[in-house]
Amino acid sequence: MDPFTQHMLEKAEQRSRALGISNASKFPLVECSVPSSSATSASGGDAGVLAPRSRSPGGQSAASGGGKVVTLGKATLEASPAKPLRHYTAVNKENLDMGIEINITTDKPIGVQVEIQEQEVTDDEEQAEGGALNPLLEAEPVNQPLARLRDTSRSRLQRMGALYSNTDDLSSPIHRTEGQFHVTTGEEEDCGNRSSRQPKQRLGKLAALADTINQWEDDTSHHEVHRLLEAPPPKPHLSSRRAEKGPAPLPPKKDEVDEASRTKQLKWDPKVLSSLEAQGFQRRESSTIKHTYDYAKQEEAAPASKVEDAVLTAKPPVPQKSTTVSQVAKNFASSAPAPKPAPAPAVSVKSGLVSGRAALFENKGTGGQSQGLRNQKDPCELSLKERMKLFETGNNKAMLPMAPIGSAPSITQIRAEEVKQHLAAMHPVTAAAATTVVAATKPKQENKLRDKVAALVANAQSSAETRIKDIDRQRQEDMQIISNRFNKQKELFDNQPSDSSVAAQARPPAPAPSRVVRPMPPPPPPPIAALSPGLASSKRRSPGDAPTTDEDSKRARKSHSDRLYPALSDLDSSGDNCCAAETASATDDSHQQDEEETESCMDESDDQSQTEDSSAGMCNGSLGREIMSAVQRNEVEMQQQQTGKKTVRYADQDMYYDDSSLNSSQVSAGIDDYLDEALVEDYGSTQDDQSDSGDEQNASRLSLGSKGTTASNSFSFRKNPASICTPIEEHHEMEMDLQTPLLSGAQPVKSELSVNQDNDNLVTLVHTVSFYRRQQSANSSNSTPVRKICREQQVMRSALAGDCHAKHRLEYDSPQQSDYVAAATDIADQTDEDDEEMQNAREVNDASQAQDKIKKLLSEVCKQQQVIGQASQALNLCAATVEFSGSTESVEGERYLLLATHRRQACLDEVQRLRVENSIRPVGAPKEKGLLTVKDITIPLRQEYVRKMASNNINGHHLVCLLKYNEHVLATKTVPTMPGLLSVKFPDVLQLNNVYADFRITLEIYGMLAQRDQLPHELKYHINLNKKGGIKTPKKKGGENRLVMPPVQSPAGPHVVRTPQLVQYGFAIFSLREIQRTTWTLTQVLGVSPLEGVVHMKVNCELSVSVEYKGFLTMFEDISGFGAWHRRWCYLNGSVINYWKYPDDEKRKTPMGSIDLNSCTSQKVTTAPRDICARLNTMLLECERPALETDQESLIIVPNGRTTTVRHLLSADTKEEREEWCAYLNKALTLLRAWGTTH
């Protein structure tokens, strides 16, 4: 053997020891195990093969389970220098005279000593050595010549491949699933210590360093930390394992197991035990300690004896809960020794050996295949991604559900799986520890299983009976509604038998006494499918169906194991299957159902509501046939009484509910088409087809988001060429409901079916069930009127009352038209959703701004109240003195009091509006603000008043003007009327900022009578001009009060709040449309007024924010009849577009030309028509000006009599620039038309 191979074998041996794998070279194969006596009588040549393979330089010992001890002792032996002995020890010592002596000792007084001396290794001996190293070698008794005929290189490579393999069957170094956790005895440890203390020569240090590095590579101290899933069972006190141990000993032979033989006390590491128990391993009492895994698989009958003792792989499936775990824990915790059972005749496979792993791998081909299938989860429990992963991983077969999708599995199926899990978990434990015989007959197990299932069903009867009573009561109420609906038709057209006779006529035969008897309505057939073979033969069944209990009759049958989707024959046609399907759908996809439907567990009321809505569901019983005959006689009149549908779309989820008048003619017209087609169908008996169609009509109500599918044997629909069929996406439900209803041309046809010749000519569906469901749900709208609730942007009722978009209005159309309207609404659904989110954000922002504004207004109200108080005090003072009574100071005080009073009231009105509307601006109001200026207010006076003023008959009036806009109130100065003046002119200029384009401003005129000043100014304020200088010394007595107080004061005191004495003479209201006027008519308030009744003023409105945009445009110019394009730098500012040749010329030169948008007649700036200009990205602006004599018609000049239209062609460089220019130009035109020309 070359040094490289020798080094690799030694390293592999060290790796196996560090990983806790038993030394497979010392283990014979289990199927070829021989008694120990045959091993002791081995020949010298065989022993010589084993001798150099000893790992330790010193003697080593290994202990077996039966108490046999094999001792390898060292003996000196002379060797000639010409033939050096080959050493395969850890330390390679050269030219060392050494021999090997093997002492084999057993508990019996028998000892055999074999001496092996040095000899030349021949090819035959090398082959024998390779046979000893190969773990997969079928080691027959030692004298068998096959052991020496193996190929040396193949055996070594196989062993190295087994140790370095990364297969799933190989034991994990962390989990330590090997069963050989034996501890070396003190003698072996002492022997190992003696060998380690021997001095090492030459390469000793290097070998020690290499061994340390190898230990680094195979360090197993970093174990995974597993959290305990459940409390570990009580375990006996076991001493921890020793850190240093020798190689695993030889396993015991089953022929040598003796009750009198002693087994060494095993020492376990508590961490290892807790880790194993957390992974699902269980403790058991047996002659050889093994760890079994709690599998939830059904054990096969044939390989049961082999799998019973086999150690499972390191990657087991997820353990399931078993009822035998606590029992095993109790048995293991009991310290009383249990009698050991007789060993099974089957050969056990030892763990840790490659041969054992190969045996497990071979077993997978037979029984393991069926067990692997049972380990899979039900597809209905998986998510969409997990089911997609099934097809991506390349498995041969898809997982199949326990029951058809949309229905829950029956109680027998669930309990059968649990019982199988119990048997699978109990099997490896009871086979080795229990004293009873494991091989029991299968009928007895089935009897026990039936007893358990019966007990479980009996416990559930109490709760099921209450549900059944509620279901029956709901069924009776629903069927009463259906019968009343058609009774009205019978009374109108024909005298038909009463519903009571019909119901009595259609009542099914009484069920057998073994079943639970309860009253059943006619449409769903009673669940008597499993009573008699005669009745069962008329129903389509899956091949493996068996008679079931009452609870099981509500479940759909399990589909075939070779198909992913169920076939037509897999579903039972009993009416209760529909209920079970609805139960599964309501629990899985509750967001797609009504809240009332999802509140109950069994949801029978939902089933009946669907039966009411479904036309096919009404035909299940004899009542359905009676209805059929009634609606066929009145077919012509019922088709004429079609009612429209109301389409409103504003829901958050794309859910569809039924709503409109439950007109029987509308329902009957759709039922008639279904029934006529159903009578022509040749699926078999009419009753079977009606039952199946009822099942599928109920199943068609399953939500689109359901992950499962069920078989469909009802109708599929062939659309007209004009209609469009778009599949409904499950997640982003942007469906196009363009399917024409059945009344408008689409006719039901046979379902497209395919016959599976390989599986008993079984009829299967071409498409998935979801495809047929979508077709049914789209075309069953005529059976019951449907109200489609669609998501729509929330708009205020005030906007709905006005002229809104078509999609904001309620439309009452025919079913076909409403489908197209709904489809058009679906297209803009995503946009509406985004608009709704943006509008919600704007509403929240407006609400917060409104609250902030309310706070500011309330603070302004407080300020104005203070002004009112101060003005009232001033007026009280003026009224209390003779000097200031009726003076100009009192008039100014009246003005301040008037202004503060109106400002306070305006703020309170605005606060009230904000609290009601909760927004600063109403929805749809313009956002542009401007500056409003009012000046030169002139009020003409009446001629009679002017004459009286000239004759000094009256004293005149004081006038003041108030300009009011929302919470803003402005006031002019008080101006008196003077003799000889025909009008009163106010010199003030009033400006209102942040005025919106929809403003309505009120101009109010107030006045009061004037009084002549009785005292001059000096006397009024007691100004003494005749005194020379001031008094040197003050007077002894206080200065006399020269202000004469009137004898009568205000009864409320000097601090009372006064009402303004200024009264309103008239008012005028103007808006943006009247700003070009200069004269407004006043609305007179009082009968006697000095005003003539009109007011003259100048009003100017200016946009506070002007539109500005700059960029290059290529402009078309007509030069002597020829067109030319010139590139210009254009600048839009307000209502004028100026252009230069270069951008730098904008600040230095005057514009080369300009375009005034005030004269633009284009309603909207868009792309120029191709008959005028075919250049890309060209905009057209048409302006109008007075006609000139030199105007000649051309491409850009169009004479129109007195006016001439001038076309401006402006070409942008890119499409984006053209769109930006169009947006800014249109905005400028809109503002100009709203605010008018700036003055």
UniProtKB/Swiss-Prot annotation:
One BP term from GO: actomyosin contractile ring organization
The Low complexity compositionally biased stretches are 53-63, 500-518
Quote the cellular component terms of the Gene Ontology held in the record.
Answer: actomyosin contractile ring; cleavage furrow; contractile ring; cytoplasm; germline ring canal; male germline ring canal; motile cilium; nucleus
Composition bias (Polar residues) maps to 699-716
Q: How does it assemble?
A: Interacts with and bundles F-actin.
Q: Which domain of life is it from?
A: Eukaryota
Biased composition regions of type Basic and acidic residues, renumbered to the chain: 252-265, 551-563
Phosphoserine sites (modified residues): 712, 744, 754
Compartments annotated for it: namely: Nucleus; Cytoplasm, Cytoskeleton; Cytoplasm, Cell cortex; Cell projection, Cilium, Flagellum
Q: Which InterPro entries match?
A: AHD, Cytokinesis/Rho-signaling, PH-like_dom_sf, PH_Anillin, PH_domain
Question: Where is it expressed, tissue-wise?
Answer: Accumulates in the ring canals that interconnect cells of the germline cysts in males and the ovarian follicles in females. These structures develop from arrested contractile rings after a specialized cytokinesis in which the closing of the invaginating plasma membrane is incomplete. Also concentrates in the arrested cleavage furrows that initially link the oocyte to its 15 nurse cells in the early egg chamber and is subsequently lost from these furrows as germline cell division is completed.
Coiled-coil zones: 834-861
- Segments carrying the region annotation (Disordered) are 32-67, 230-265, 493-621, 684-716
Where does the PH domain lie? 1106-1230
Iron as a keyword of this entry, yes or no, is: no
Pro residues bias locations: 519-528
Q: Which organism is it from?
A: Drosophila melanogaster
Function as written in the Swiss-Prot or TrEMBL entry: Required for cytokinesis. Essential for the structural integrity of the cleavage furrow and for completion of cleavage furrow ingression and proper formation of the midbody. Required during cellularization of syncytial embryos for the proper formation and function of the furrow canals, the stable inward folds of the plasma membrane which separate the peripheral nuclei. Also required for the formation of the pole cells, the progenitors of the adult germline which are formed by cytokinesis of the cytoplasmic buds at the posterior pole of the syncytial embryo. Essential for embryonic viability.
Point to the regions of Acidic residues compositional bias: 594-610
Q: What is the effect of changing residue 1143 to S?
A: In allele scra4. Strong maternal effect allele; abrogates cellularization of syncytial embryos
| Source organism phylogeny | Eukaryota, Metazoa, Ecdysozoa, Arthropoda, Hexapoda
Listed A to Z, the keywords are:
Actin-binding, Cell cycle, Cell division, Cell projection, Cilium, Coiled coil, Cytoplasm, Cytoskeleton, Developmental protein, Differentiation, Flagellum, Meiosis, Mitosis, Nucleus, Oogenesis, Phosphoprotein, Spermatogenesis
What SMART domains does the annotation carry?
PH
Q: Which residues are annotated with the PTM Phosphothreonine?
A: 740, 831
Q: What is this protein called?
A: Anillin
Q: Name one Pfam family in it.
A: Anillin
* Region entry Interaction with and bundling of F-actin, spans: 126-371
